[in-house]
């Protein structure tokens, strides 16, 4: 059996794996246990009451968190003409068509989000094998294929998170950094859960949001009692 590190021993002593914590208590616990030498992200796992094997019950989308994620995001946009100028004005680092595709084919991937106008998908379509495995392929369901590329760039820069359930029906994403004020982390979590509720598949039966856990990059998950969240979530 692997020997527990001192950090993991402390976490095991502090975190009761059988308990659902009030959100404020959960955040305080994460902050106390975040001892890494960098500012850890606060991640969330949401167990949904869906059958992930059925395509009509899969949940996918995007939402802008009110306080952002604390990350600086580099955006690449496939578009042309007036849209290209609008994308640059909105803060996109890379804008182009075939020239941008050529850079990507060469392995130049200095960006975190890819956005495309519908007319550019003929170019982006060639890059599926490169962008797809990295989760970067533009998709209208998450607002990254859109005629309004400037707004999409602004959303990405403002702290938009994209979400998609895994094969077990769990959503994994981030809600900020551990040095955020507790209120901001709480409001970001609530905004995400409201977005997930709006995205509930009509075919999903029973309890939809079954479990919510938050953790830091290097820490253990802490289950959150949903009763302590705002009425808009419950």
From Swiss-Prot:
One of the primary rRNA binding proteins, it binds very close to the 3'-end of the 23S rRNA. Forms part of the L1 stalk. It is often not seen in high-resolution crystal structures, but can be seen in cryo_EM and 3D reconstruction models. These indicate that the distal end of the stalk moves by approximately 20 angstroms. This stalk movement is thought to be coupled to movement of deacylated tRNA into and out of the E site, and thus to participate in tRNA translocation. Contacts the P and E site tRNAs. Protein L1 is also a translational repressor protein, it controls the translation of the L11 operon by binding to its mRNA. It comes from Escherichia coli (strain K12). Keywords: Repressor, Ribonucleoprotein, Ribosomal protein, RNA-binding, rRNA-binding, Translation regulation, tRNA-binding. CDD domains: Ribosomal_L1. Belongs to the universal ribosomal protein uL1 family. The modification N6-succinyllysine is found at residues 105, 154, 186, 197. GO terms for biological process: cytoplasmic translation; negative regulation of translational initiation; ribosomal large subunit assembly. This is Large ribosomal subunit protein uL1. It holds the Pfam family Ribosomal_L1. InterPro entries: Ribosom_uL1_bac-type (IPR005878), Ribosomal_uL1 (IPR002143), Ribosomal_uL1-like (IPR023674), Ribosomal_uL1/biogenesis (IPR028364), Ribosomal_uL1_3-a/b-sand (IPR016095), Ribosomal_uL1_CS (IPR023673). One of its GO terms (cellular component) is cytosolic large ribosomal subunit. Part of the 50S ribosomal subunit. Cross-links to the P and E site tRNAs. One of its GO terms (molecular function) is rRNA binding.
